[in-house]
Amino acid sequence: MSTCKLTGKVALVTGASSGIGEAMALALAAEGAVVAIAARRMERLNELADRIRQAGGDAFPIEADVTDEAQATAMVQRVLEDHGRLDILLNIAGIGVAAPFQNTTTSEYRQMFDVNVLGLLYAIHAALPKMKAQGAGHIVIMSSGTGRYIHPSTVYSGSKHATSAMAESLRREVGKDGIRVTSIEPGAVKTEFVSRMRDDVRHSLRRDAAT
């Protein structure tokens, strides 16, 4: 009998091509879950899937842009068609321009809200009916400490405040259906995203995370 905690479970991780999403996928696979890994960078997904399989896990890549509702829906449907269930949905895909409001373009506004807010809504909307039918499921939403604390990054912070609020509201809506909702609000994590931040914003995030 397997001692892995997630044997028999099926998980879908968005934003799995790097950073926190990649780490989450590896951890889930190590605990026995079948892991669907989704992102736009298929080459990286294939590399990650190979690493998981070589370690004895089960993973399959799905190329998807979560800002496209049709692609996000198809991503979830692919998991359901292949495995018949979806137990864990981790919405890790995210993007940010950690800069003051006047230094952020309108194109960047749209991009942050498209990925950080609409992208996760599309995936959740597609997954919820099956989770309700199962009577169980776990939805994980990647927010950020910047959604709670003040930083010179108005638009990014606003998008993450929205994700935190949505997680809290969704938890109240679907708890009766046996579905758990978790919001993760980390400070600065050593990933590609943080490495592209301005130094003052990165240091501010680390300072707040330590207090």
Place the predicted regions along the sequence by residue.
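Conserved glycine-rich cofactor-binding loop
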Residues: 10, 17-18
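Conserved glycine-rich Rossmann-like NAD(P)H-binding loop of the short-chain dehydrogenase/reductase
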Residues: 31-48
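The beta1-alpha1 cofactor-binding region of Rossmann-like NAD(H)/NADP(H)-dependent oxidoreductases
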Residues: 42-43, 63-74, 106
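Substrate-binding pocket helix/loop in short-chain dehydrogenase/reductase
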Residues: 100-101, 108-110
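Active-site loop-to-helix junction immediately N-terminal to the catalytic Tyr of the SDR YXXXK motif
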Residues: 104, 150-158, 169
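Active-site helix of classical SDR
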Residues: 124, 159
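Residue(s) in the substrate-gating loop at a strand-loop-helix junction
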Residues: 144
